[in-house]
Amino acid sequence: FRELTRKLMGRLDAAEWMSMYERLTHWLVELSRSEDTGMKEVVDMQYQDADRQFAKFVRDEYGEWMAGPGEEVPMMSHRLLPERLPVSLAEAEGRPTFLVVIDNLRMDQWQVIEPMLAEEFRVVRKAPYVAMLPTATAYARNALFAGMTPAEIARVHPDCWVGEEEEGSKNAHENKLFSRLLDRLGVEGKHGYHKVTNLAAGRSLLENFHQTKDARVTAIVYNFVDMLSHARTEMEVIKELAEDDAAYRSLTLSWFEHSPLREMFSEMARFGARVIVTTDHGTIRVDKPVQVRGERNTNSNLRYKVGRNLGYDAGDVFEVREPERFGLPRPNISSAYIFAQEKDFLVYPNNQNHFVQYFRDTFQHGGISMEEMLVPWVELDAK
C-alpha cells in the first residue's frame, strides 16, 4: 500500500495508470472478502485520491491521445478493433473467434467473473484499454464497432449516426458498422453479430448457438450488466441489493452464474474458440451533485452534457469547446461538451433536491473516472 501511495505521488503515464487501477481493484476485491475494515478504509482513500489525480491526468493528456498514436498514447475505443482484431484472428488459425462486448463491464467485475471461466479457458492476453469520452454507449460502442471516432462516423457513415438531438436509437447500426469495418480490414469469411438486451433474447441465442460455429468471427453485445446498473435508478430492489461496489460485484457474479451468457461461454469452449471479452465503457457510483444550466433540449445523461449555452463552473467539469479535436461531432456551431469527474453528477437547479435524492448512489457513465475509462480487453483460448 505504501508503494501504491508513493507511485500516486509521482507522474504516471497511461500504462502505469492501467497497472495502478488493476492493483487497486484487486485489493478492493480481496479486502471485500475480509473483515479488516481498517485496510478497506486505507484502500478506499487511495482509490479516491487516484480518481482525483486520474481526472487531472485525462484533462491534461486527452487532446494528445486523440491526435493520434504515439509512444505514450494508450489504446482507445476507435483504434481497438482495427489494431487488435486482425492479430487475434491470425492467432486463432481458422478457429471461430467470438468478440463478447459486455456493456458496462468494469475491471473489478471482470476480476470476479474470470475465475468462473478458468476451467474451460486459459488467458492468452490481458490488455486493458481507454474508453473514449463520452463514456456512453452512443459514442464509445459505435466508435468500437466502426473503428472510427464519432466525428468520423458522422462524416463517413451518416446513415449510421444518430445525433444527440435526433429521435431514434443511437446504437441501431452497430452491425452495419462492424461489417464495414471487417471489409475495410480485409477479413474474409462469414461473420455474425448478435445483440442481447434481455433474458428471452439470451435464451433464444443460446438455443441457436450451434449456428455461430461456422462463422470466422461473431460479435455478441450483451446488455444485461448495463440493465443492472441503469436499473438502480428505476428499481428500489436493485438499490437495496447493490448498496455499494462490493454488493454490485456480488450481484454481477450471481447474474453471470445464472445467465445464458455463462452457458454460451461453455459452448465456445466446446468449439475450441478464441474468445475476446471486453466492453465499451465502465460505470461509477455517483454521490456529489454539480449544478449546471442548459437549454430545454440538452441531453439527459448525468455525467456529460452537450449543447449550446451551457452554464457551469469551469472548475467543476472538463470542458471541450473544440469537439472536432476530440473526435466528437458538433451538433451546432456553438455546441460544447462538458464531462463530470470522479463521483460527481450533473444536476439542474430546478427540482434539484428531489433529483439529487433520486440519483445519488446510482451507477452512471459518460464522464471521467478510472471505473468508466480503464476497461478490460481479455483474450481467451479454450483449453
State what each model feature region is.
Residues 1-383:
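Feature captures the catalytic ectodomains and active-site-proximal regions of enzymes
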